[in-house]
């Protein structure tokens, strides 16, 4: 049973922060572009966010920029201990995921 406490982060809170993350090429929020595929919040405060880009060959710098913005914004939420962001559907997804998710 999942019991929410005052310090537990919610999907709504994460989504609100993700609305601030803008695609560097198009200038639109990634939430408005429906690029976020999954938000998984664990009881221990770890968050897993899965997303995709608009095309499988978007420049990797865009993917890394989006990841850093996602992580910076969501890691500030009360109760968050760790944020892992996974890119999928990109030609270099494995390499990018290894580079942007330390440990």
Label each residue range with its predicted role.
Residues 1-103:
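Domain-level signature for proteins that mediate thiol-based redox and metal-cofactor handling
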């Amino acid at each position: 049973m999942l019991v929410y406490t005052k310090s537990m982060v919610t999907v709504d809170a994460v989504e609100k922060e993700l609305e601030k993350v803008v695609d560097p090429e198009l200038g639109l929020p990634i939430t408005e572009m429906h690029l976020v595929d999954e938000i998984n919040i664990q009881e221990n405060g770890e968050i897993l966010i899965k997303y995709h880009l608009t095309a499988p060959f978007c420049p990797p710098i865009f993917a890394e920029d989006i990841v850093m913005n996602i992580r910076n914004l969501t890691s500030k939420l009360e109760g968050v201990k760790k944020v892992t962001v996974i890119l999928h559907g990109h030609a270099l997804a494995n390499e990018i995921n290894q580079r942007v998710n330390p440990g």
